[in-house]
Amino acid sequence: MLSEVLLVSAPGKVILHGEHAVVHGKVALAVALNLRTFLRLQPHSNGRVGLNLPNIGVRRAWDVASLQLLDTSFLGHGDSAALTAKHVEKLKEVAGFPKDCVDPEHLAVLAFLYLYLSICQSQRALPSLDITVWSELPTGAGLGSSAAYSVCLAAALLTACEEIPNPLKDGEAAGRWTEENLELINKWAFQGERVIHGNPSGVDNAVSTWGGALRYQQGKISSLKRPPVLKILLINTKVPRSTKVLVANVRSRLLKFPEIVAPLLTSIDAISLECERVLGEMAAAPTPEHYLTLEELIDMNQHHLNALGVGHASLDQLCQVTTAHGLHSKLTGAGGGGCGITLLRPDVERPAVEATKRALSGCGFDCWETSVGAPGVSVHTAASLDASVQQGLDSL
């Protein structure tokens, strides 16, 4: 067991193109969002294990001795593919939670317990440690916050238990794990996601692990080679929506108007493929024309999504505001409210960006200036973290 403090971060994700079409076998492009989740793991010898999640007001601690006495044979031995619904029920018993608890606070604690007990059972004794996780990502907004949480937990626990090495080299501010170690982190993070979501696609944890951009189609996930980092505005309309209902609405529209809706889905697929091609070209040398093409694809996709019936007045307003400032936007994720993204070309001047952000805030939206194509899960030195992150990890 390592004795040093570990500081780990992982990015969120946005869908660039292909939302809804992906449900019908088409390509989706998911990109790592540089709003990150940060984890601090502090080993100690007080015989307790603590979990602090200041964003959602969770503070829990357990005696290691009592966890040690639990029959955890149901977890399998270091097998990251063995999680079943029965295991989740058993974890609820262990945590003293009601059987029907499905709120984010309870599920976050269950995912932690699952990963801690499973990964650390290789140790002679369960380790005493404190884990604090603080995130720049809003929860429940379709931005992969639970996957970033699971990825941070898996990476930190695997490193602390010396299942994988700490990749941080002397004199470096941040370190990334090898491909083989990332595979293991991703496997465990997927199990954490299964505790939280039941039956996730695996896209969110893969994007958070590897960063950059991924292509997803019918269960197959592949990385795009060296995608460019694109500056964006991420806007949360704060209009709640149900992904399940929106997906069902698209399906019923497809059944009602197959000749109309099937070609829309094919067109969205073509938009995703064209975007993938452009991003590939940009890896070598981005040109102003590339950015103009990306903007055209954003506009076309937004209109297609409106035709599928997953738009919303708040998203129309978002697009109108950004268009008035010469920028191009689309919804990201399920639609019906939720979040949108706006591409910031390199030639957009500072005053225009600030004016756009003010106008969006004036609509009651939350707005972040950030980037996509961000690095995946990383380990950091304390000195390299922003003061706001340090403060977040010290809160509660």
From Swiss-Prot:
Catalyzed chemical reaction(s): (R)-mevalonate + ATP = (R)-5-phosphomevalonate + ADP + H(+)
Any Pfam family: GHMP_kinases_N
Active-site residues, Swiss-Prot/TrEMBL: 146, 204
Leading EC class: transferase
GO cellular component: cytosol; peroxisome
Activity control note: Farnesyl pyrophosphate and geranyl pyrophosphate inhibit mevalonate kinase activity by binding competitively at the ATP-binding sites.
SUPFAM superfamilies named among the record's database cross-references: GHMP Kinase, C-terminal domain, Ribosomal protein S5 domain 2-like
The enzyme's E.C. designation: 2.7.1.36
Residues that bind Mg(2+): 146, 193
Entry keyword Glycoprotein: no
Assigned keywords, A-Z: ATP-binding, Cholesterol biosynthesis, Cholesterol metabolism, Cytoplasm, Kinase, Lipid biosynthesis, Lipid metabolism, Magnesium, Metal-binding, Nucleotide-binding, Peroxisome, Steroid biosynthesis, Steroid metabolism, Sterol biosynthesis, Sterol metabolism, Transferase
Molecular-function GO terms, alphabetical: ATP binding; identical protein binding; magnesium ion binding; mevalonate kinase activity
Subcellular location: Cytoplasm; Peroxisome
Classification via PROSITE patterns: GHMP_KINASES_ATP (PS00627)
Binding site for ATP: 13, 55, 135, 140-146
Pathway info: Isoprenoid biosynthesis; isopentenyl diphosphate biosynthesis via mevalonate pathway; isopentenyl diphosphate from (R)-mevalonate: step 1/3
Cofactor: Mg(2+)
GO biological process terms, semicolon-separated: cholesterol biosynthetic process; isopentenyl diphosphate biosynthetic process, mevalonate pathway
Function of the molecule: Catalyzes the phosphorylation of mevalonate to mevalonate 5-phosphate, a key step in isoprenoid and cholesterol biosynthesis.
NCBIfam families with a match to the protein in the record: mevalon_kin
Subunit structure: Homodimer.
Family named by the database record: Belongs to the GHMP kinase family. Mevalonate kinase subfamily.
The name this protein goes by in its record: Mevalonate kinase
UniProt source species: Bos taurus
Gene giving rise to this polypeptide: MVK
